[in-house]
Amino acid sequence: MAITGLTAGGSAEYEVRLDGTRRWPTGGDRPPSLIRTLPPAGPLELAFGSCRVTRPHRPPYTLSVDEHELGTGVDALYALAVRMQAQPADEWPHMLLLLGDQVYADEVSPETAAFIRARRDVSDPPGLEVAGFEEYARLYREAWSQPTLRWLLSTLPTAMIFDDHDVHDDWNTSQAWRARMRRQPWWSDRIAGALETYWIYQHLGNLSAAELESDALLRRVRSAADGGPVLREFALAADCDGGGGRWSFSRDLGRTRLVVLDGREGGSSRRAGARCSTTTSGAGWSSRRAVTSTIS
């Protein structure tokens, strides 16, 4: 849904209704969800981070690994949301940028592990790793459905790009790695499910209203009686050597341009043969001031 005609530097509360019934917000003592527009001048504040393993927000998972073998420490994305709820809106970041490993397909939570066990025999590969579209969709729902995180994502404009664990540890680090994985009988369902759900849960939110309007794949999915086969065909082609899929994107934020590059899947870089580029992602979250630059 594209909303136009908003005033720069403004904010507006909103709610979501389906068939006349309010679906969001769901209640509780959280602040209202807001649509905020960028200020006409001044610096931009961007919160960013990566490498978030989804776990329940309770001990022992919130303990450090030194305190308990199941501990993963404080969920910094959750902490950001809690901090924002205690602040006035003018102290919030203007945007959230997630730089990879938004989900871990190869290191699932106890809840997702139970979901997988109920669906298939985990003694067969890939075991308790995510196997396809349905399990990926479950993974994304779990990652972002906790009420405090839902509020954060409903209020803070967010952009994101994958790294390796969104698909598989060390994804696309070399042509030899790709050849080895393609020999696994479960891999085609895994990579198809990974890119299908990435397109739905991450990529579409990176596009502007104009880009969404002109996106040929989105039109095909919307017009199909069942968009699943259309999306799977695209995902498998995107992963093929030379098939390509454009995942890099940019956003113009006033006088600042944010450019986010795909360092994992860019198909054009494999047309000559070996996959040679890798990326590293740092764990943790921080907030910094974006440098204001003039876009010519």
Which residues does each predicted region cover?
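Metal-dependent phosphoester/phosphodiester hydrolase catalytic core
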Residues: M1-S296
